[in-house]
Curated annotation (Swiss-Prot):
GO terms for cellular component: cytoplasm; cytosol; nucleus. This is Ribosome-associated protein oga1. The keyword Acyltransferase does not apply. Phosphorylation by TORC1 upon nutrient replenishment inhibits STM1 and causes its release from dormant ribosomes. The modification Phosphothreonine is found at residues 160, 166. Gene3D superfamilies: 6.10.140.1040. It is found in: Cytoplasm. InterPro entries: HABP4/SERBP1-like, HABP4_PAIRBP1-bd, STM1-like_N. Ribosome preservation factor that protect a small pool of nontranslating, vacant ribosomes in cells under nutrient starvation conditions. Under nutrient-limiting conditions, cells reduce ribosome biogenesis and degrade ribosomes via autophagy (ribophagy) or proteasomal degradation. To avoid excessive degradation during starvation, STM1 binds to and protects 80S ribosomes from proteasomal degradation. Under nutrient-sufficient conditions, TORC1 phosphorylates and inhibits STM1 to prevent formation of dormant 80S ribosomes.
Length: 284
């Protein structure tokens, strides 16, 4: 908001017309120069945040960390396993597991059965040129030495059936209750040793052995008895006690008042003197 100002001193007419015209000309020429001359671009310089103490040729701490990480070999991220893999893959993992068989034939894997099915093609150790040992051969096909020494036994072994000799059936031992009770009654009871009686024999009773030597170590019972004897015994005395009746409490005693002597005290202590003629002989 602009307010037009009015020069009140123009009424005095002190200013010359030449001065006003020169000032107007100078102001007009100044405005013309400003409008004719093109604007000069101003150079903006950013404030430097770097310290003068740091060497500009050396890399910054951030550049050092970036270069260090670039030089290190990139670690391979480990694939998830177990429950983590199952949780990440979800239904896809279950579908893939169901699609793939357990082994080549689709049967549950068993190392022995799998080895028997696949043969000896992928064995770690070669089996060419290997022969069973003598002990294994004799166990599987019999002992050749014993068969040659006892040909009769060998022939009998060949004629016998494959099964072993069946043992004879055992007879069942079954008894009734009456038979069992009768056997128990008939069984002889054990008889104790009979005491032989001797003639001209005297009865000897054993007594406690006498202590020939005083034992240095005391038994537990002796220690307890000695401890009981050493303890002081309590002595009880009979005392005759007499009780007297408590005297009855009297009334409140006469006490002097707080502000001066009491009336009773003044009567007893300050009684008026009795005067007689003997006290005044001059008046007789």
């Amino acid at each position: 908001m602009s307010v037009a100002s009015k020069n009140l001193f123009d009424l005095l007419g002190e200013e010359t017309p030449a001065a006003t015209t020169t000032e107007k000309k100078t102001a007009a020429s100044r405005d013309k120069k400003r409008s004719d001359s093109p604007p000069v671009p101003r150079e903006l310089v950013a404030q430097s945040t770097t310290s003068r103490k740091r060497d500009p040729n050396q890399p910054t701490p951030r550049e050092r960390t970036v270069n260090k990480k670039a030089d290190q070999p990139r670690r391979r991220r480990q694939a998830p396993q177990g429950n983590e893999a199952f949780a990440r893959e979800g239904k896809e993992a279950r579908a893939n597991n169901a699609a793939h068989p357990v082994d080549a034939t689709g049967a549950p894997s068993n190392r022995r059965n799998a080895r028997a099915r696949r043969g000896r093609e992928f064995d770690r150790h070669s089996q060419t040129g290997r022969v069973d040992t003598k002990k294994a051969t004799e166990r599987g096909w019999g002992d050749l030495v014993n068969s040659a020494a006892n040909p009769d036994v060998a022939e009998n072994e060949g004629n016998t059936p494959s099964g072993a000799q069946t043992p004879a059936a055992e007879e069942e031992n079954v008894k009734t209750l009456d038979e069992y009770l009768s056997e128990r009654k008939s069984a002889a009871k054990p008889v104790g040793r009979t005491v032989e009686k001797l003639e001209n024999a005297t009865k000897v009773e054993k007594s406690a052995p006498e202590e020939l030597f005083a034992s240095l170590k005391k038994s537990a019972s002796q220690k307890k008895s000695a401890a009981k004897e050493s303890k002081p015994k309590k002595v009880l005395l009979d005392i005759e006690q007499t009780f007297t009746a408590r005297p009855a409490r009297g009334g409140r005693p006469n006490r002097a008042p707080r502000r001066g002597p009491s009336e009773t005290a003044s009567k007893t202590q300050q009684a008026p003197p009795t005067l007689s003629e003997t006290d005044f002989p001059a008046l007789a």
